[in-house]
């Protein structure tokens, strides 16, 4: 049974008022927070103009706003075990953040300027897209990753994950009982801690065969490793999924192999469309075409 008290408690909502009347309203507000909301709404308007029926999915993937997402589509994604692609996650932050960082370096900025600018922009992006626990986990780990590059240090995922968890729990310890927090960090544990052990075991088993592997064998091995990595993440998060949702998609392992490689195309085309729409709507129409084709498929 859904524990609404624990769910809202994690969001610092402890009381519910019914049929309340507002007698006085504060006029104070965060000007910068309102600015980020206005920017998000501007981008959402551009996507609604240019993406047609796929606008809701684009807004969820690019802006983290599921308000206009078709409930039936959301249910299909959830039943298929791929609902996570509609949330701002580590995959989204990595694709956008590292893409931005590499782009800034290519246009002539050094490691320090490119890294600092990418850090600032991605932090604002995380705040603009709602600042959910999974988003802030991804942003924290991205900040640590780029910070390590700037400082000339080596970044490792388990340390970054632990630091992100500490920072988030310091802000709100109740997140330790939140499903989103546990699933987000459970996925990172799967790919960053469990998967390397499985991979090491596979390498030991295949060490004798490596000299005899041909090109087809290499492709087969890559597909097998991708499938195993997806399976490891699914199995790592399985207890959490069953505890909070009571059901699991067996097909999710296979569908993730097909869906995850295309997320970058949808995210990239949606982001390009939103940015181009500030200058030219026609350019935005063209930019979102690849993403629309994938979402329709």
Where are the language model's segments positioned?
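Membrane-interface amphipathic/re-entrant loop segments adjacent to transmembrane helices
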Residues: 28, 33-34, 79, 215, ...
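Short amphipathic alpha-helical coupling elements at transmembrane boundaries
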Residues: 45, 60, 75, 105, ...
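Generic alpha-helical structural context detector
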Residues: 59-63, 168, 233, 292
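Short helical patches
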Residues: 32-46, 198-205, 209, 279, ...
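Hydrophobic alpha-helical transmembrane segments in multi-pass membrane proteins
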Residues: 17, 70-253, 281
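Membrane-interface helix/helix-cap signal primarily in integral membrane proteins
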Residues: 1-84
């Amino acid at each position: 049974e859904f524990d609404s008290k624990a769910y809202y408690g994690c969001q610092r909502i402890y009381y519910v008022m019914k049929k309340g009347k507002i007698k006085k309203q504060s006029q104070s507000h965060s000007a910068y927070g309102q600015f980020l909301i206005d920017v998000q709404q501007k981008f959402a308007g551009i996507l609604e103009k240019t993406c047609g029926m796929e606008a809701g999915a684009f807004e969820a993937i690019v802006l983290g706003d599921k308000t206009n997402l078709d409930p039936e589509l959301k249910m299909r994604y959830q039943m298929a075990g791929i609902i996570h692609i509609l949330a701002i996650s580590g995959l989204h932050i990595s694709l956008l953040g590292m893409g931005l960082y590499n782009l800034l370096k290519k246009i002539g900025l050094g490691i320090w300027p490119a890294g600092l600018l990418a850090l600032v922009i991605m932090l604002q992006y995380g705040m603009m897209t709602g600042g959910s626990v999974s988003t802030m986990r991804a942003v924290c780990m991205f900040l640590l990753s780029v910070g390590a590059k700037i400082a000339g240090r080596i970044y490792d995922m388990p340390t970054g994950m632990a630091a992100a968890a500490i920072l988030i729990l310091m802000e709100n310890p109740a997140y330790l009982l939140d499903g989103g927090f546990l699933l987000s960090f459970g996925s990172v544990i799967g790919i960053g801690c469990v998967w390397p052990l499985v991979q090491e075991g596979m390498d030991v088993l295949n060490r004798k065969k490596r000299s005899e592997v041909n090109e087809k064998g290499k492709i087969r091995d890559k597909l097998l490793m991708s499938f195993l990595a997806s399976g490891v993440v699914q199995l790592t998060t399985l207890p959490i999924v069953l505890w909070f949702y009571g059901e699991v998609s067996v097909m999710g392992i296979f569908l993730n192999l097909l869906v995850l490689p295309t997320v970058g195309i949808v995210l990239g085309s949606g982001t390009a469309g939103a940015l181009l729409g500030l200058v030219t709507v026609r350019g935005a129409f063209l930019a979102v075409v690849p993403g629309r084709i994938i979402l329709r498929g």
